[in-house]
Amino acid sequence: MKSHKTPLRYPGGKSRACTKMDQYLLKVSDCKEYREPFLGGGSVAIHITKKYPHLDVWVNDLYEPLYNFWRVLQDDSNALYETLCDLKSRHPEPESAKELFLKSKEYLNDESNNDSLQRAVSFYTINKCSFSGLTESSSFSKQASDSNFSMRGIEKLPGYTKIIKNWKITNISYEELLCDNKSTFIYLDPPYEIGSNLYGKRGSMHKGFDHDQFANDCDRFVSPQLISYNSSQLVKDRFKGWQTGEFDLTYTMRSVGEYMREQKERKELLLFNYGTQGLVEFN
């Protein structure tokens, strides 16, 4: 399952960064549990699960439509697969795919629609047919509907179900996963401190995220933690006493306005509260 990196397109996703991050993840092999409070596209958790199958894995995301997708992928993958195959076969052209995209967006935005399978189908459809991979914040992309909303991608979903079958998946606030257990490794990929609001309904999960409180929360616990952030002196100053590493990271998405233009020149910052040896500097 080497080709199984993430079933989703997600802004800030780490599918291309896992190999560069591996040297900072060496501590994981000594642990019994892996936790990820901001699951997003899940590429790091999938990478860890495949590389360290002995670990108990607890993943979480506060964004409910995303959480719901992962739960359905885990618990009802056959129905998800069959429904998406049927929809793709009936909407093969961009014109009909756009109609499906708009209906899916309307369905997902109506909070009275609580059928978990249909909401997961709608989320996946929007994710694959949009410019950015976002839901409420996205617009339809003809190119994405053809290249990303594909039978090939849908056919890979059962493979992801096998990988995540033993995950504990929750929809709670990140701090509930923090702990003092030194045999629990925690990887945190919070909303970045940037100008654009990418996550949640109308960007609420970016706009409303308290970065100062997040730093204080992480600093209170002694379990090994690795945090991904946008590199800035302000971020580093919040994590006094933590070790840092940086590497270049170019994302594949180019369609979220000024945010993505800025990404071409930025560094990925890693903060960690444990010792490492033999680190290699990546460019």
Regions found by a protein language model. Give the residues of each.
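Conserved S-adenosyl-L-methionine
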Residues: 30-92
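Short, solvent-exposed loop/turn segments at secondary-structure junctions
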Residues: 41-44, 63-65, 129-132, 174-177, ...
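Short His-Asn-centered micro-motif
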Residues: 37-38, 60-61, 170-172, 188-190, ...
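SAM-dependent nucleic-acid methyltransferase catalytic core
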Residues: 2-24, 28, 74-201
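Short loop/helix-cap segments at secondary-structure boundaries that form the rim of catalytic
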Residues: 51, 178-182, 234-241
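Long, positively charged, glycine-interspersed low-complexity recognition regions
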Residues: 205-283
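Short active-site oxyanion
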Residues: 31-34, 54-56, 164-167, 219-225
